[in-house]
């Protein structure tokens, strides 16, 4: 189960989790299809303090890598979290597996915000953002989301491939997996 998996991930880096609550922010499966460029896991202790954040990055080849960040007490009380990680996963044929990510996360409350900067040898190579508002999980909100954007997971994959085609047509260097 996902719970067993996340508990093992936390234990591997020495985080005492004690069965606290876990939330994941990811794309939904729609008509049997999903793609999550990034899933963000929020791991809380029994006292409801945020103990760890895991950024799980996926590529279109089915590979994934997790960047697990234990939080100090100061971090857990901060409204904005900043994390850095060395890039470990081949994500794009137009970017090498060098450099690193800088994450800026606002996890609290009714709104959520994530900014990811991929920095290579030449400076910023990519900046991606994701903003969301919390809503109730019920049939009404699910139906509304489906009608509003029925194929959002497919749209994400199409946009990634469209951008790759655009970069390829501009004769950007390609690095193959």
Predicted regions and their residues:
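Mature, function-bearing regions of proteins
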Residues: 1-177
């Amino acid at each position: 189960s996902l719970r067993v998996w996340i508990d093992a991930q936390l234990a591997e880096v020495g985080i005492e989790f004690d069965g606290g609550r876990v939330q994941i922010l990811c794309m939904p499966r729609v008509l049997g299809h999903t793609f999550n460029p990034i899933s963000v896991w929020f791991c809380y202790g029994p006292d409801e303090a945020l103990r760890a954040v895991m950024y799980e990055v996926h590529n279109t080849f089915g590979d994934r890598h997790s960047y697990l960040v234990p939080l100090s007490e100061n971090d857990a009380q901060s409204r904005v979290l900043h994390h850095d990680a060395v890039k470990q996963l081949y994500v794009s044929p137009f970017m090498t597996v060098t450099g690193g990510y800088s994450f800026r996360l606002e996890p609290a409350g009714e709104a959520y915000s994530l900014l990811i900067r991929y920095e290579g040898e030449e400076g910023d190579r990519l900046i991606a953002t994701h903003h969301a508002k919390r809503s109730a999980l019920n049939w009404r909100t699910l139906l509304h989301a489906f009608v509003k954007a029925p194929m959002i997971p497919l749209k994400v994959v199409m946009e990634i491939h469209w951008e790759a085609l655009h970069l390829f047509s501009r004769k950007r260097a390609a690095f193959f997996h």
